[in-house]
């Protein structure tokens, strides 16, 4: 689960991490009061969306002005004007896609007198099952670009969970950022606090970009991005309360209500499969035959008729879907249950696109019989290769 920048900074503040002072606003009329509380003389007006590249992004609406999603204001009047322009407008960044995201909240933050910018992040290293630090002197820009163009400027290391964070980890970060004396001590203290926060809140990723050194000699997190482990949210009701569903895909939210593993993709063939591995293979073979999947959807091993019906409705709700491939290998999941769910869903929502069904495994003959006698226009398939070829041909011929 992702949260907004201002929420991430509030979480870090709980652990004593130095972050800038600011106030979130939801209406343009709140901008003046927020700016006055901060005092000035410089303010930063930041769009709050779940996507990076806000500063270099552009708004779709001409009324929002030519500047990006992060703007420097040198007067309260400018803060008010930016708030009016940005709230409700659609911001397009390198991470939002062409559709962009509507800005429904802003973060008004005090300006900082910046001397240097750094990059610092913590993430779960799946290869070592440890928390990894990634550090660079090249802050304020895409770490992917740094890795591609100047990989020697990136330092990374993992923390042994048996020992936890130790002093030498902080000193490693300080050395990587060329910090000495008092600034090195600040870095060491910050590293310990960030690690503690990461573990305590079950984070997946914590990115500070940029981490800045002010001209007063203080380290400060100028931006913060946090992603939490969804499987651990039951332990953190305070974090659950920070969820902003307007930033999430409506179909993915609906799928989560039925414990369906669903991810929206940008293709045109909807997929319903049981098992993550089989789902990946199904998407691969669709790609092999020249088309792209519209989603990843794993209904799991013990899906009910109602769950299958819900899954089918979610797929058909996507206007980009031009065909549907259902690929089920029945083990715990029975093929007749899938068939009943598909028939019920089609009769309820209708079917305007080609549908190919491949069933194999437990109760397969009963499942095929249900579909055959349903009166629906369904193309049966004998195996995965046959199913992929049939759905691709049907969509191209439609």
Swiss-Prot record:
Span of domain ATP-grasp: 9-254
Cofactor note: Binds 1 Mg(2+) ion per subunit.
ATP-binding as UniProt keyword: yes
Cofactor(s) needed by this chain: Mg(2+)
Annotated disulfide bonds: none
PROSITE patterns: ATP_GRASP
Annotated Mg(2+) binding sites: 209, 223
Pfam families from the UniProt entry: ATP-grasp_2, Ligase_CoA
Pathway: Carbohydrate metabolism; tricarboxylic acid cycle; succinate from succinyl-CoA (ligase route): step 1/1
A single GO molecular function term of this UniProt record: succinate-CoA ligase (GDP-forming) activity
Complex and partners: Heterotetramer of two alpha and two beta subunits.
Purpose: Succinyl-CoA synthetase functions in the citric acid cycle (TCA), coupling the hydrolysis of succinyl-CoA to the synthesis of either ATP or GTP and thus represents the only step of substrate-level phosphorylation in the TCA. The beta subunit provides nucleotide specificity of the enzyme and binds the substrate succinate, while the binding sites for coenzyme A and phosphate are found in the alpha subunit.
Protein name: Succinate--CoA ligase [ADP-forming] subunit beta
Gene: sucC
């Amino acid at each position: 689960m992702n949260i907004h920048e201002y929420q991430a900074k509030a979480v870090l503040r709980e652990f004593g991490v130095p972050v800038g002072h600011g106030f979130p606003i939801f209406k343009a009329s709140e901008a003046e009061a927020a700016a006055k509380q901060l005092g000035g003389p410089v303010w930063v007006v930041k769009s709050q969306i779940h996507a990076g590249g806000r500063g270099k992004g552009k708004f779709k609406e001409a009324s929002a002005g030519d500047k990006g999603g992060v703007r420097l204001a040198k007067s309260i009047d400018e803060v008010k004007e930016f708030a009016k322009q940005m709230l409700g407008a659609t911001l397009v960044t390198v991470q939002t896609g062409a559709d962009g995201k509507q800005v429904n909240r802003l973060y008004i933050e005090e300006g900082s007198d910046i001397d240097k910018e750094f990059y610092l992040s913590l993430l779960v290293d799946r290869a070592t099952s440890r928390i990894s630090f990634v550090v660079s002197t090249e802050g304020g820009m895409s770490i992917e670009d740094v890795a591609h163009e100047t990989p020697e400027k990136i330092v990374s290391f993992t923390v042994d969970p048996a020992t936890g964070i130790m002093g030498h980890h902080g000193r490693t970060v300080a050395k990587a950022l060329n910090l000495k004396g008092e600034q090195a001590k600040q870095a060491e203290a910050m590293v310990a606090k960030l690690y503690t926060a990461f573990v305590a809140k079950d984070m997946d990723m914590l990115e500070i970009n940029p981490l800045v050194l002010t001209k007063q000699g203080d380290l400060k997190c100028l931006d913060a991005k946090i992603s939490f482990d969804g499987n651990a949210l039951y332990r953190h009701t305070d974090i659950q309360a920070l969820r902003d569903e307007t930033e999430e895909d409506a179909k993915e939210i609906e799928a989560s209500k039925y414990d369906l593993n669903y991810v929206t993709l940008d293709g045109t063939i909807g997929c319903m499969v049981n098992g993550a591995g089989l789902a990946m293979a199904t998407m691969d073979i669709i790609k092999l035959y020249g088309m792209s999947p519209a989603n990843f959807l794993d209904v799991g091993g013990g899906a009910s008729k109602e769950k299958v019906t819900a899954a089918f409705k979610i797929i058909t709700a996507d206007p980009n879907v031009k065909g549907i491939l259902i690929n089920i290998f029945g083990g715990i999941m029975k093929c007749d249950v899938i068939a009943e769910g598909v028939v019920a869903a089609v009769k309820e929502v209708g079917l305007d696109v080609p549908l190919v069904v491949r069933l194999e495994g437990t109760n397969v003959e009963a499942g095929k019989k249900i579909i055959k006698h349903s009166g629906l226009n369904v193309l049966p398939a004998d195996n995965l290769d046959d199913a992929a070829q049939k759905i691709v041909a049907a969509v191209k011929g439609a």
